């Protein structure tokens, strides 16, 4: 039994499907009735995630056209489960015949085999990045809910292959204006790398071309910011907001580390440097800086939510790598065929945004049941 495919408490999401199966999809349960939602709302987010958009992504071409099967009537959510489906159109399973019994280094081939005794070797099966189609579709629904509360989410690539973008130091500021965040998002979306720094984006692309020519891959850093998040979200002690965000982001394939706010830098700061001073502004409590990343004690403060994640290099590379043949019991060398992203961070951005949206939507619904007044 594979029991880890459902996420959330009140706003619950179950993804299903494999990379080379007939289709892939998601069921969203717990979305309140009365929210305007169309296939175009979902398609807009899926188009940002889909492969084949630039030289920075895999050459697999999938339209990723979504079909909403239930939960919507005349463009309005009904409060019943929302089921969404995307057909797989461009799978080339023959590319994977040679690795049926030879687990690829860096992939989940070996661990899925050990756990279940059987695995779908075609494109990674359930462990493929293709699974994130369902996450992004569900995230589109969550974002429609969050828009009712004025929440905005934006993600971007801040580092790729050791090349860093020149960006504001968000932790040094207690707030981020909506216009500034939307500008960052627009600049990121205009870049094939999804990096809002045009000069850094150009250097990243050049590096990516070089790495691809070498038959190799590179990783990077993705950041996600959420503003307009109301204070009070989070359920201590085990369902803290930052704990759920970390789980959500770590559940994305290739993500190897997550930071909230100052993150690992906080280990090098003194308390006087780490603590965010409070002050009154227009009758409301605000913060002079945001090392906490918008969360204290597992509960949102109302300041921007700041998340960063380290994304490892794509494990599928053309270079020869040592592995084993699980039938013959011998050591062998393989080079991975197929169409793969030379670097994953640009495509992880909409997935990471979706996971943050799912967590915030879930906690907004939970908070509405936490107190009467």
UniProtKB/Swiss-Prot annotation:
Q: Where does NADP(+) bind?
A: 49
Which stretches of sequence are listed as region Disordered?
Answer: 42-61
Q: Please tell me where FMN binds in this chain.
A: 126-128, 297, 312-316, 339
What pathway is this protein said to act in by its record?
A: Metabolic intermediate biosynthesis; chorismate biosynthesis; chorismate from D-erythrose 4-phosphate and phosphoenolpyruvate: step 7/7
Name the cofactor(s) required for activity, per the record. Answer: FMNH2
Can you quote a single GO CC term? cytosol
Q: Mention one GO biological process in which this protein takes part, according to its record.
A: chorismate biosynthetic process
Could you tell me what the cofactor note in this record states?
Reduced FMN (FMNH(2)).
Looking up Pfam families in the UniProt record yields: Chorismate_synt
Query: Keywords, A to Z?
Result: Amino-acid biosynthesis, Aromatic amino acid biosynthesis, FAD, Flavoprotein, FMN, Lyase, NADP
User: Which chemical reaction does it catalyze?
Assistant: 5-O-(1-carboxyvinyl)-3-phosphoshikimate = chorismate + phosphate
Record's PANTHER family? CHORISMATE SYNTHASE
Q: Which family does it belong to?
A: Belongs to the chorismate synthase family.
Q: Which NCBIfam families match?
A: aroC, PRK05382.1
Question: What is this protein for, i.e. what is its function?
Answer: This reaction introduces a second double bond into the aromatic ring system.
Q: What is the protein's given name?
A: Chorismate synthase
């Amino acid at each position: 039994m594979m029991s880890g495919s459902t996420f959330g408490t009140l706003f619950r999401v179950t993804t299903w499907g494999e990379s080379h199966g007939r289709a892939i999809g998601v069921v969203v349960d717990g979305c309140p009735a009365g929210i305007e939602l169309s296939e175009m709302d979902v398609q807009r987010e899926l188009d940002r995630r889909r492969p084949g958009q630039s030289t920075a992504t895999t050459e697999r071409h999938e339209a990723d056209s979504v079909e909403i099967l239930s939960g919507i009537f005349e463009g309005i959510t009904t409060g019943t489960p929302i089921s969404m489906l995307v057909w797989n159109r461009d799978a080339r399973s023959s590319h994977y015949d040679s690795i049926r019994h030879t687990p690829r280094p860096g992939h989940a081939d070996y661990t899925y085999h050990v756990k279940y005794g059987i695995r779908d070797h075609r494109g990674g099966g359930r462990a493929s990045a293709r699974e994130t189609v369902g996450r992004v579709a569900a995230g589109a629904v969550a974002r429609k809910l969050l828009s009712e509360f004025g929440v905005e989410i934006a993600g971007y690539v801040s580092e790729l292959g050791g090349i860093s973008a020149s960006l504001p130091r968000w932790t040094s500021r207690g707030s981020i204006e909506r216009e500034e965040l939307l500008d960052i998002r627009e600049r990121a979306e205009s870049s094939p790398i999804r990096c809002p720094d045009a000069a850094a984006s150009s250097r990243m692309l050049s590096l990516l071309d070089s790495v691809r020519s070498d038959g190799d891959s590179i990783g990077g850093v993705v950041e996600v910011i959420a503003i307009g998040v109301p204070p009070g979200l989070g359920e201590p002690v085990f369902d803290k907001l930052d704990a759920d965000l970390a789980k959500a982001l770590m559940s994305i394939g290739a993500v190897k580390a997550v930071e909230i706010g100052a993150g690992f830098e906080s280990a090098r700061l003194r308390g006087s440097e780490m603590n965010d001073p409070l002050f009154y502004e227009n009758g409301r409590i605000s913060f002079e800086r945001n090392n906490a990343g918008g969360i204290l004690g597992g509960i949102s403060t109302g300041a921007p939510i700041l998340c960063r994640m380290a994304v490892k290099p794509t494990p599928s590379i053309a270079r020869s790598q040592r592995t084993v043949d699980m039938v013959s019991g011998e050591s062998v060398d393989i080079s991975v065929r197929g169409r793969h992203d030379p670097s994953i961070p640009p495509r992880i951005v909409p997935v990471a945004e979706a996971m943050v949206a799912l967590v915030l939507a879930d906690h907004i619904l939970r908070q509405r049941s936490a107190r009467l007044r």
